[in-house]
């Protein structure tokens, strides 16, 4: 199907295989759009994130933008979180049953964590409505713990986190916010953590 070709084109540099349920759900998000349209949206998003990240701006607002973002970024994000979590768990002797995915986006970190941990409860915090809708739609296609995940609309830079979890994951979040807001957010992440705080950021000169 052409949707699969689009995914391969948009994610050609990201070789991490996604779970079948997630990959299938991702394909459904772009049904009805032509490959040229998706490539244009992907390029616009890439330019926007490259040039405007780090100021706390809203970088996408449409559901199709969030869907394309998921297609482009989820394989790499899923892979990065999977590797970081796997490595961290080698040095961890506690028990993890609850997850808080902060700045969850389309939920890649949650899917990666669920693949390695016996999670019983998942909470996702995401500011952007389009991202929340896409993330929820994707998780509805997953296992019960994913489909029953609780999604919270909140701006991390201005609101305290009012829930806690055994593991708190923040992936590709800190670098997108203004520097002045990072300490406040970090303090809140740590306060919400019962056992492990995992922060994943891009390994670039401009990264956090």
Regions found by a protein language model. Name each.
Residues 57, 61-83:
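Class I SAM-dependent methyltransferase Rossmann-like catalytic core
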Residues 128:
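Conserved SAM/SAH-binding beta-strand->alpha-helix loop
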Residues 136-161:
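S-adenosyl-L-methionine
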Residues 166-180:
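A short SAM/SAH-binding and catalytic strip from SAM-dependent methyltransferases
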Residues 194-203:
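Conserved beta-strand signature within the Rossmann-like core of class I S-adenosyl-L-methionine
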